[in-house]
Curated annotation (Swiss-Prot):
Biological role stated in the UniProt entry: Lytic polysaccharide monooxygenase-like protein that has diverged to biological functions other than polysaccharide degradation since it does not perform oxidative cleavage of polysaccharides. Acts as the major cell wall sensor that regulates MAK-1-dependent hyphal anastomosis, the fusion of hyphal cells. May also act as a cell surface-bound protein that functions in the copper-accumulation pathway.
Transmembrane segments: none
Name of the encoding gene: ham-7
Cofactor-binding details, from the entry: Binds 1 copper ion per subunit.
Species for this entry: Neurospora crassa (strain ATCC 24698 / 74-OR23-1A / CBS 708.71 / DSM 1257 / FGSC 987)
Species classification: Eukaryota, Fungi, Dikarya, Ascomycota, Pezizomycotina
Protein name in the entry: Lytic polysaccharide monooxygenase-like protein ham-7
Membrane topology label: Lipid-anchor; GPI-anchor
Glycosylation site residues: N55, N98, N139, N174, N180
Disulfide bond sites: C47-C157, C122-C178
Amino acid sequence: MLTSTLLALASAALASAHTVITYPGWRGNNLKDNEEFPYGMQWTYPCGGLTLTQNRTYWPTTGGAISFQPGWFQGHATAFIYVNLGIGNDGPDGGPKNMSFPMVSPFQIIGPGKNPYPGTFCLPQVSTPAGFEFKEGDNATIQLVELAIHGAALYSCVDITFVPPGDPRVAQVNESNCFNSTDLGAADLYTINILESGRDRLALTSAAASLARMAGWVPLVAGGLWLML
């Protein structure tokens, strides 16, 4: 009984997290649930339960904008964002074999709260992965991963075809499809905010440094517990 209850709670958490890619396009609507995905689609690797689309979006060979809305459902007070590229047509569904090539350094988004919220986050110029050169007509898939606060990874994709910069087939980037909402913030992935004792200001410290300090407490705690035995 307890196991089934925990599974239901975990499934509810998974179903509560959704992201929409607003530019350059979107593989398709995976905000829904159905018999195959009773708790929602977006937790399914690699593209949130959707197979390759033939309705590809044109994107410059030198890179371009990516815009998304991270807070469609609850559970996004904070989240980690990853943007990856899958290359080619050799995968099982005619798309990439994997999504192994990072396009940006992972970062954290900070929303206004845990409840659903409107808001758009824009990366105005995302380069193609280092070491790759693409030519007109090459196919790829951009994968957006949102690691939500409850621990679930949510996946959305857009299938692209590369074209030269300035090609008129590339959708125009403007203030309506690529902008940063004022109630959304961003931070380095491994940076946290702490309030220093006796001071009314926030200081930034790395998570690694925090873990190092915690490691120093472990022998003291262990010794205290041993004395209590």
